Amino acid sequence: MGSSSYGDGEGYSVYGQRFDVDGEQAGDAFQINTETYNNQQDPSIASLQDGGFVVTWESRYQDDLDANGNGNSNYGIYGQRYDANGTPSGSEFRVNTYTSGEQTHPAVASMDDGGFVIAWQDSSGHDGGSSYDIRCQRYGSNGETRGDEFMVNSYVSNDHHDPDITGLDGGKFIVTWGDETTHANRPGTDTSGWGVFGQVFT
């Protein structure tokens, strides 16, 4: 899976290639993003409990496309589910609720209940956030949202970048990210500047 600048004639697009258990190609490479305006890039993929998979990526100008197909916002986060045969399950969907600022650098992980969770870097400033925060959205096994999107980082001073996410046993998951916060009262603060922080969710 990766981004290509040659597929749809508009800019970067996200493509995938399935492989069998022996590492042999299963079918041809295929385009994942439905919307092709401007750039779709920086994909992340996770296998699901039912044998399918989900892909997420950042898409430029798609959040607020007007009637003429012209975008007015910057990057947003999108996703597409597939079944075990590599057939799309439903339509491409937007992940981020808030469209101001930029939503970039998505990461996705599967959950042991059949669902999945997506994290991303966000500059909307929602919930009193800083220049860049980390936000998340959970999904059920049928691709339905579970609750609202939420901010991951507790401290909002300075910047929080480049999330990664992993599903854990018992319906838990952990999000990690690069963090510039040097608050004196913050446990584990890396006073040298950037540090790596994490948060477990249940």
Regions found by a protein language model. Give the residues of each.
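Extracellular, repeat-based ectodomains that mediate carbohydrate processing or recognition
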Residues: 1-202
